[in-house]
Structures are given as structure tokens and as C-alpha cells.
């Protein structure tokens, strides 16, 4: 159901259509935020990195497909990845070639867009170690490749980074960065900044120690590496580190905010999105949950997990840090997208970072200092009551704090957060942020785990279930300055796909029951939808083909953490399976099956 501005959030579903239709006029009266010019260059019709640009807006200036003609979209071609696992990747387009990366075994395909049906030009198989599948937390997914300087860069599940010649498919270099015997894997999309390929490690549910690392794009050799826990030297905290909040100031907090030696298995992995401001020469990245999930075993703030770092792109030196969830209680990894915008805030120009977080808040943060300007909830909340802007600290609800060997009920949001990794999109035309997210709550029981390298290190039994209203997914339009929802589309299942906004006033996203949808960017009206052969958890992209026409691409193939019940053939009777997601997703098996197909659409 479409829900207008006047409806009660998570309350009775009621549509005020006239008010919803007035939103375009309201939005146009306000100054439209813009991305830094260098971080969001002029539209060239390509899609060379998953986030579209360094500012991570996922916005295209292409407008051939618009609100009037999108209803006429039809399939241009399809392509099978040959892998029926979770397809989280973003198809890239560079010149007249499309690049598609599969989940494990991480095969890279190049398709010729100049020919009818886009035939295969070449494929590259990195042949990752099959044992990596056994230590992948949440399906054998990969979030996509990136292109720079004639090469395609991507990660493999067995913790390698690969560079491939974009024209020929020949391997240029391949570098091993992790040890699957310790539970270290890689699933993230790299970011290339100047001559460096920046990547991070996965494995937070296995007691690994998180890090981010820059490799030389020409050789694959390590240039710098920064850990998320441990002494300042390891975290690359030095004299230029100037966090905004007092709780982040002090020496070696990556040790002192943990029990003795616990930081060595402390998590804080870096498996999500990275943004870059060329004017400030700063990269921005999140850090994931501390380990184990059971917070009773790790008293303290557990620096530097569950937060956001700003780092010098050349050296990795930390400039500031903000912790969204000190002493994280509920697995609220802070790895979601970090959208860079230049806007007027309370009468002053600000360089901000907009972050729809796992905690259920949309944060607006000054990206030069780390000061939180706003933190407004976009998800039903019971576990927290707000964020204190003076201290920056989230306010936990004591009644929902986990206790060993006792079930704490009705915690909202869940361990998967108000939203997970699946990225939002920001339209420079409407000035609106479009957020694909969940509507889930959970019951949680903490238990005591023991650390054994290469085995799960969690310490919690979780059961998720639908949030208020009974639906589990929402696609929301968000007013950044006002800190409020403009309209929301309710979906039966959690939204696990990304979003793309276009200058044609059309926004695209997919659902876990297999629908690829186009909605009106200003009103939320569903203008077109197409049923694919499997649930969608991928990232849509749009591009201008060699024929001058606009196309839209999406990978279909259910899986990931939310869809593991299907992709992993899990028993629906075990509600704690997939770290609690099976309890909420039992019906998914009845509406979709495994898949692995690329769909590309165009106008007639």
C-alpha cells in the first residue's frame, strides 16, 4: 500500500492522495542539496562503480525514461550468471561493455552491448577456495566490481582482490589479504581512489579483527592498512585525529574500552560502502559490529567498532570518528551507505554526510568535523529512545538490553537494523532521499560463546518477526532537512535491493518476491513493475547504450542474509537459523525460488 505524508508512521494505513501530490511543489520551494562537483562528475551515460560516483548518490541524469513512458519498458536482453545464489552485485557499463560479477565463485563476465542480445565477450574465473563457502556469514554474495584506469577490480569470497584487464579479461594481479581458516572473507565492492584500491574484510561473526586496506592499483601491493581495534598506531590514529565528541578522545581507546585482549577478536569489520571527497581528500567508511554479539562479554564502548571513520585517502590516517552504537547491543554494523552532499543547514553552508543507519536513524553529519547535526528515526524503535546531539551518544532503552540466558522480547529494529547494506539513492532533481529498508523486530537471548578460530563467535539466539503493521519492508522518501518521511510504500518482505534515482523522476528498486518496480519520485506511485524469475537483492543501474538509448539493469537471484532460507535451503522449522531471519521469512519459499539472471530493460 502507498502511504502519504499525512498517515501515522507504522500506524493505521491511510492515504491522503491530495497531500502526497502536493509534495513536488513543497520540495521545489526548498534549495536542493548537491553533491560535491568533484565527487559527482557530469553524466556520461556510463556506470563505472556500484555507487555511481564518489558521493554515493546513485543518481543518474539520464531522463529518456520518465514518468510518462516508463510504463512501456520491455526486456532488451537477459543473461544467466550460472550461479543460483544471492545476487547482490551492481552491473557496470563502461563504454560499450557491461560487466557482471557473480556470487561465489565470483566469475566476471563481459557482455558486448554493440551486438543484439549482448553476447558474451569473455569471462574470468578467479577460482576461489571452495572452503570459503563454509565460513561466509550470510550467503556467498558479492556487492560488485568497480572500473578504473582500464581495469576491473573486485574481491573474492576467499579474501583475494583481483585486477583484470577490462578489454581482454586477462588477470593483471591477484592479492591474498585474508585467511579463511580464521573466518576472514571478502564480499564488498572496492573503491578506487587515485592509484589506490581500497577494500575491507568480512567475518565479524567469526571473531576476526576488522581492517581497511589500500592496495596499489597497478601492482596489488599494500600501501596502508588500518585496523578497527587495538592500539592507536594500528588504527592509524595520530596527531591529526580530531574527533568531535569527548568520548572518542584519549589514547589507545581501541584497547582500554575492551576487556583485556578482547579487542584481538573484536570485529569492526569493513564490508560495506566507502565514499570519497576529492576536495578534502578524505574517504569515509563504516565499521561493523563488535564481537561477539553478546555485549555482556565485552563491557566498554568497544572502540572503534560500530562507527564512521574519516581518513586521509593517501595515508589512511584517521581524521575523525563517530560511534553510532557504543557498546553495540544488537549487532548494528555501521557499514551502510555514506552519501556526501553540500547543502545549507540552519542558514549556513555545510559539507555533510547522510547515513541511513542500522540503528534506525537517518544521520546528517558534518563530514569535515564529525559533528552530528541531526538523527531522526525512519524505523519503528523500542531498543533506543533517541540520539543526544550534545554528546553524540545513542540512548539505549534499558528494558531492551540483552541479558544472559533470558529472552528479551520485542526489540526494534533487529540485528539486521532499520536497514542493512542495501543502498539508498538521492535525487538532485527532487532533493529527496529514497530508502529501501525493513520493518522488523526481534526476540533476543544472549548466551556465552567461546572463541575458536574459524568458527562462529556470536553468543545470541535471535528470532525476527514483522514490525508494526504486519509488513516487513518499506520503500520511503525522506526529507533530509526536515528529518521526516514524505511517503512510504509497504512491502510484504524486507527490502534487500538497492535503489537508483533518475532525472526522469523515476526511482527503481526490487523486492524479495521478485518484482522490479519503477515509482514516481515525487509521489511514490508505482508506474511499472516486472516479475523476474527470483527474488531481487541486487543493485539497479541505468546507462546510455551505444544506440543512444537509456537502459535499466538489475540482477535477480534471492539470497543474502534475509533470503538464506531459499538460497541456502534452510529448514523453516528452525526460527533461529540464518541468525534469526528464518523465523520471519518462512513464507518466502512459497513465493520465489533460487535464481541468477540479469535483466536489462529499454523503451520500445
Residues of each region from the PLM?
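Repeat-solenoid scaffold signature
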Residues: 185-221, 328-390, 400-412, 416-421, ...
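Bacterial N-terminal signal peptides
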Residues: 11-25
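Short, conserved, GDST-rich strand-edge loop motifs in beta-rich repeat architectures
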Residues: 199-211, 257-259, 285-302, 408, ...
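N-terminal cofactor/phosphate-binding cores enriched in small/glycine residues
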Residues: 60-178, 502
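Beta-propeller blade signature
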Residues: 169, 210-221, 301-316, 366-370, ...
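N-terminal pre-domain segments of enzymes
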Residues: 28-63, 588-592
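Extracytoplasmic beta-rich repeat domains
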Residues: 79-90, 123-146, 174-189, 227-273, ...
Amino acid at each position: 500500500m502507498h502511504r502519504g505524508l499525512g498517515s501515522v508512521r507504522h500506524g493505521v494505513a491511510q492515504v491522503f492522495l491530495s497531500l502526497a501530490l502536493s509534495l513536488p511543489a513543497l520540495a521545489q520551494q526548498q534549495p536542493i542539496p548537491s553533491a560535491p562537483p568533484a565527487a559527482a562528475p557530469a553524466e556520461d551515460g556510463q556506470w563505472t562503480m556500484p555507487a555511481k560516483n564518489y558521493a554515493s548518490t546513485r543518481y543518474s541524469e539520464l531522463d529518456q525514461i520518465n514518468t510518462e513512458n516508463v510504463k512501456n519498458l520491455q526486456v532488451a536482453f537477459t543473461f544467466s550468471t550460472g550461479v543460483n545464489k544471492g545476487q547482490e552485485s551492481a552491473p557496470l557499463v563502461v563504454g560499450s561493455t557491461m560487466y557482471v560479477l557473480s556470487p561465489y565463485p565470483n566469475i566476471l563476465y563481459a557482455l558486448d552491448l554493440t551486438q543484439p542480445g549482448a553476447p558474451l565477450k569473455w569471462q574470468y574465473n578467479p577460482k576461489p577456495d571452495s572452503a570459503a563457502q563454509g565460513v561466509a556469514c550470510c550467503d556467498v554474495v558479492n556487492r560488485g566490481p568497480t572500473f578504473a584506469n582500464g581495469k576491473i577490480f573486485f574481491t573474492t569470497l576467499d579474501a583475494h582482490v583481483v585486477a583484470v584487464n577490462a578489454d581482454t579479461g586477462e588477470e593483471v594481479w591477484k592479492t591474498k589479504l585474508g585467511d579463511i581458516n580464521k573466518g576472514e572473507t571478502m564480499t564488498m565492492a572496492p573503491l578506487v581512489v587515485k592509484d589506490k584500491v581500497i577494500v575491507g574484510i568480512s567475518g565479524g561473526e567469526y571473531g576476526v579483527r576488522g581492517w581497511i586496506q589500500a592496495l596499489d592499483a597497478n601492482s596489488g601491493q599494500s600501501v596502508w592498512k588500518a585496523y578497527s581495534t587495538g592500539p592507536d598506531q594500528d588504527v592509524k590514529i595520530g596527531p591529526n585525529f580530531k574527533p568531535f565528541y569527548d568520548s572518542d578522545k584519549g589514547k589507545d581507546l581501541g584497547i582500554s574500552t575492551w576487556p583485556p585482549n578482547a579487542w584481538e577478536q573484536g570485529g569492526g569489520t569493513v564490508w560495506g560502502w566507502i565514499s570519497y571527497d576529492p576536495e578534502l581528500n578524505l574517504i569515509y567508511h563504516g565499521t561493523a559490529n563488535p564481537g561477539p554479539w553478546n555485549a555482556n562479554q565485552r563491557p566498554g564502548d568497544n572502540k572503534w567498532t560500530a562507527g564512521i571513520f574519516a581518513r586521509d585517502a593517501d595515508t589512511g590516517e584517521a581524521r575523525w570518528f563517530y560511534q553510532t552504537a557504543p557498546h553495540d547491543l544488537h549487532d548494528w554494523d555501521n557499514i551502510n551507505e555514506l552519501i556526501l552532499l553540500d547543502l545549507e543547514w540552519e542558514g549556513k553552508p555545510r559539507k555533510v554526510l547522510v547515513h541511513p543507519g542500522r540503528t534506525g536513524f537517518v544521520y546528517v553529519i558534518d563530514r569535515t568535523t564529525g559533528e552530528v547535526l541531526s538523527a531522526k528515526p525512519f524505523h519503528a524503535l523500542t531498543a533506543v529512545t533517541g540520539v543526544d546531539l550534545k554528546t553524540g551518544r545513542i540512548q539505549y532503552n534499558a528494558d531492551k538490553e540483552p541479558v544472559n540466558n533470558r529472552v528479551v522480547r520485542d526489540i526494534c529494529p533487529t540485528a539486521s537494523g532499520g536497514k542493512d547494506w542495501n543502498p539508498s539513492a538521492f535525487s538532485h532533481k527532487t532533493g529527496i532521499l529514497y530508502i529501501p529498508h525493513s520493518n522488523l523486530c526481534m526476540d533476543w537471548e544472549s548466551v556465552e560463546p567461546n572463541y575458536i578460530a574459524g568458527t562462529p563467535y556470536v553468543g545470541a539466539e535471535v528470532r525476527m518477526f514483522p514490525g508494526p503493521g504486519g509488513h516487513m519492508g518499506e520503500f520511503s522518501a525522506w526529507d533530509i532537512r526536515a528529518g521526516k518521511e514524505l511517503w512510504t510504500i509497504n512491502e510484504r518482505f524486507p527490502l534487500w535491493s538497492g535503489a537508483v534515482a533518475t532525472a526522469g523522476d523515476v526511482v527503481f528498486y526490487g523486492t524479495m518476491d521478485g518484482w522490479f518496480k519503477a515509482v514516481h519520485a515525487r509521489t511514490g506511485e508505482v508506474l511499472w513493475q516486472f516479475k523476474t524469475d527470483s527474488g531481487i537483492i541486487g543493485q539497479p543501474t541505468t546507462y546510455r547504450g551505444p544506440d543512444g538509448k537509456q537502459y535499466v539493469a538489475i540482477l535477480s537471484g534471492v539470497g543474502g542474509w534475509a533470503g538464506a532460507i531459499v538460497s541456502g535451503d534452510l529448514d523453516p522449522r528452525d526460527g533461529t537459523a540464518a541468525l534469526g531471519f528464518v523465523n520471519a521469512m518462512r513464507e518466502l519459499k512459497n513465493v520465489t525460488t533460487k535464481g541468477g539472471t540479469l535483466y536489462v530493460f529499454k523503451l520500445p
